[in-house]
Amino acid sequence: MKLSRFSGIILSLFVILAFSSLVFAGSAGDEALQKLLDGNKRYVEGKFASKDLGDSRRTEILKGGQHPFATIISCSDSRVPPEHIFDQGLGDIFIVRVAGNVVDPIALGSIEYGVEHVHTPLLMILGHSDCGAVKATMETKGEPEGNIGAIVKKIQPAVKKAKKKGGSKDEILETAIKENVMNVYADVMKSPVVKELVHEGKLKIVVAEYNLSNGKVEMLELPKVKHEMKKSEHKTEKKSEKKAEKKTEKAH
């Protein structure tokens, strides 16, 4: 009985430590997001923070390695430079830029590197207003070809969904931009690496849209993606745990 109680205490301590690590990881992601939003506020107001972009900073991140606090997947559009719109400096954010902010295995590999190997607690999927890639997809007739066609194919589902919802041309464009961001989120969540980090509470994912007109970044509501453990799997795991506990009690 004494050993059984001791095992129970150890298990309780383990649960507390695990929960504490999840809370810490969650707060790290929240803090990283707040840093981005604070930076965007400075950008919009034109009150930029002083940044060391000289020799000392370059030497620091060369010798000490990179330690960015966020990974961002954004569009290649020259009007959407994440470092500027979030008022960040050298080594602050790990960025993956692709036209239309879509992802393929190569882009996903870069994202995985940022969240798993560079250990950023935050991943932001950033779309933007008046996106040329989405516009081009809306105007495409027939089967898209070539390398640009590969981008168009990734965006087409969002455009089709937006057209079904209806509205003016501008409204359809804006809806398609948001739908595309959500589709990218779903694609990112197919990554086993990303899924595991989210499940373990080590990674926070957010989706957002940058407004080219006013410079503001608007946070969007995440869609529900089934990345959690299936209920049947969860029940099986619970049963296995209970059996293991009973065997331990009998042994003692």
Annotated model-derived regions:
Residues R79-V96:
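Catalytic core of membrane glycerolipid acyltransferases/transacylases, capturing the structured
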Residues M1-L11:
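Bacterial N-terminal signal peptides that target proteins for export
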Residues S74-R79, A99-V102, H128-S129:
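Short glycine-enriched loops at secondary-structure junctions
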Residues A25-G65, L90-G91, N101-H119, G132-H252:
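Divalent-metal-activated hydrolytic enzyme cores
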Residues I9-S21:
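Bacterial N-terminal signal peptides
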Residues I125:
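Conserved functional hotspot residues or short segments at active or partner-binding sites
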